[in-house]
């Protein structure tokens, strides 16, 4: 049932997107609270991941930007690194490595968010583990001063949303699982008493 390429329409891609969504998020729709926390967390993740990706892309294309615009991105980064107490070239290399490795760390966190949507308890390991790797790597390569001075207040709010949302949701999901376990244990006892 393949159509010739000249007869394809944009809406022909919709079944593919539905399949990808089902593959990532599963077939079962979670409760409203999980969807709400997931939406806020996904927004925070998307903004932080986008900012990381754009920063890495700008760093990769800094030579092209300098040729076309006459603006040296690397000089700005080197000066900023010197303000933070780094040797400028060292800071540039550290920032490049940090941004590159964070692409994979943000992917790990996304896997955790997909597991959150599916209400799998293991998702906290992916989200908190990814964030812990992110922050430890940031502090060791760029320093705590980088977090204080160069991470914007908006980004700090996004980190807060991601962490707080995950904490609240993981606490409530563990309570929900405990309640379900208690109810399943008490039901067989009631049946045996009725006999």
What feature does the model see in each segment?
Residues 2-195:
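Topology signature of small-to-medium multi-pass alpha-helical membrane proteins
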């Amino acid at each position: 049932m393949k159509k010739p390429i000249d007869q394809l329409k944009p809406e022909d891609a919709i079944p593919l997107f539905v399949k990808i969504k089902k593959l990532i998020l599963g077939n079962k729709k979670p409760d409203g609270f999980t969807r709400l926390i997931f939406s806020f967390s996904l927004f925070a993740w998307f903004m932080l991941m986008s900012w990381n990706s754009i920063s890495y892309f700008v760093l990769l294309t800094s030579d092209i930007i300098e040729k076309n615009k006459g603006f040296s991105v690397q000089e700005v980064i080197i000066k900023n690194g010197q303000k933070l107490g780094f040797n400028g070239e060292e800071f540039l290399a550290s920032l490049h490595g940090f941004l590159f490795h964070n692409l994979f760390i943000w992917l790990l966190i996304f896997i955790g968010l997909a597991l959150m949507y599916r209400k799998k308890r293991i998702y906290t390991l992916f989200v908190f583990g990814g964030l812990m790797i992110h922050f430890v790597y940031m502090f060791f390569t760029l320093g705590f001063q980088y977090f204080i001075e160069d991470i914007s207040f908006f980004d700090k709010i996004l980190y807060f949303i991601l962490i707080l949302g995950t904490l609240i949701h993981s606490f409530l999901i563990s309570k929900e699982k405990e309640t379900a376990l208690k109810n399943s244990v008490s039901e067989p006892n009631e049946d045996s008493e009725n006999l």
